[in-house]
Curated annotation (Swiss-Prot):
The keyword Ribonucleoprotein does not apply. PROSITE patterns: COMPLEX1_ND1_1, COMPLEX1_ND1_2. It comes from the Bacteria. It is a multi-pass membrane protein. Pfam families: NADHdh. It is found in: Cell inner membrane. It comes from Chromobacterium violaceum (strain ATCC 12472 / DSM 30191 / JCM 1249 / CCUG 213 / NBRC 12614 / NCIMB 9131 / NCTC 9757 / MK). The chain crosses the membrane at residues 14-34, 85-105, 120-140, 164-184, 196-216, 243-263, 285-305, 324-344. Belongs to the complex I subunit 1 family. This is NADH-quinone oxidoreductase subunit H. GO terms for cellular component: plasma membrane.
């Protein structure tokens, strides 16, 4: 950064440096999204005793590129009676928060674009904005199917955001910070010797399960994909979209999946910390490799759920969120609060 500031001046150098860091995060993220689609098709293919994509390139590795080229070449058709400006704005409102949230995601304790103290609050605020893109997409298309899908999706996202928020309260109580780097550091000590036994997923196990399943519902993934239930409402709020406008919604969904996987890994699974004690030498050393492995395991759960569970009815989804997840999180928050101030506390106050 000092080199750029010496050439371009203080303000221009800082701006260029920030843009370079944004590009360094966004471009690999888009690549991960593309190949997550291939991984999904391969994993589900093997679970259904078939091969999956294997024609474009070796082992089908060029399939995401072929899909991107196909969508780029397709025309974006605007429905006759739609609100044209809002119709085109909706995909941007969906993908924007999904990418902007990565500004505060730490890959290691030193590798983070913006290490702000309220990073978790920033992510919660941004992810809640994604629902506006969904509602606008459903309304602007002037289709009863897209509007019904948008209403379902909005209600589902808002309902499960509450459960996710309450699950995060437990993490905030034991870590004492909204900073994601501090939350990971809090998991590096304890009676588990800094290993997998020190991470939050053990004492906060009910909150961990609620957060993971709520993340699946928040991203409208199976078995919570009633917003685009093909057998009921064609494709939900996607129904009027084509070409790159449809592809951007697709990118937003998978970018949100990766974001939920990263947050689950950071909040409950120790982030970049090794599952082995630090005394084990190189095996006990933390790093981005461990964060990537944990994210891959969480993403595999997303794909596994899609391949194995049937779709819930809409009323079942609402009942699960309001009558099961929210009471469970509230009860466990009380348990953790009492545990922290008891003689058996495993946390430093």
């Amino acid at each position: 950064m000092e080199f750029l500031q010496g050439i371009l001046g203080t303000d221009a150098g800082l701006l260029v440096w920030t843009l370079l860091k944004i590009i360094a995060i966004v471009l690999p993220m888009l690549g991960c999204v593309a190949y997550l689609t291939l991984a999904e098709r391969k994993v589900i293919g093997y679970m259904q005793i078939r091969i999956g994509p294997n024609r474009v390139g070796p082992f089908g590795l060029l399939q995401p590129i072929a899909d991107a080229v196909k969508l780029l070449m397709k025309e974006i058709i605007l429905p006759t009676n739609s609100s044209k400006g809002l119709f085109l704005l909706a995909p941007v409102l969906s993908i924007g928060p999904a990418l902007a949230a990565w500004a505060v995601i730490p890959f290691t304790d030193k590798l983070v674009l913006a290490n702000v103290n309220a990073s978790l609050l920033y992510i919660l605020a941004l992810t809640s904005m994604g629902v506006y893109g969904v509602i606008i997409a459903g309304w602007a298309g002037n289709s009863k199917y897209s509007f019904l899908g948008a209403m379902r999706s909005a209600a589902q996202i808002v309902s499960y955001e509450l459960a996710m928020g309450f699950a995060l309260v437990g993490v905030l109580m034991v870590s004492g910070s909204l900073n994601l780097v501090d939350i990971v550091h809090q998991q590096s000590f304890g009676k588990g010797g800094g290993s997998i036994l020190s991470w939050n997923w053990i004492p906060l196990f009910p909150l961990f399960i609620v957060y993971l399943i709520s993340g699946v519902a928040e991203t409208n993934r199976a078995p919570f994909d009633v917003a685009e239930g093909e057998s009921e409402i064609v494709a939900g709020f996607h129904v009027e979209y084509s070409g790159m406008a449809f592809a951007i919604f697709f990118l937003a969904e998978y970018a949100n999946m990766i974001l939920v996987a990263a947050l689950t890994s950071l909040l409950f699974l120790g982030g970049w910390l090794s599952p082995f004690p630090a005394s084990w030498g190189i095996l006990g050393a933390g790093g981005f490799f461990w964060l990537a492995v944990k994210m891959a395991l969480v993403l595999f759960c997303f794909l596994w759920f899609r391949a194995t569970f049937p779709r819930y009815r809409y009323d079942q989804i609402m009942r699960l969120g309001w009558k099961v997840f929210i009471p469970v999180t509230l009860v466990w928050i009380l348990v953790v609060g009492a545990w922290m101030f008891s003689p058996l506390s495993i946390w430093k106050l």
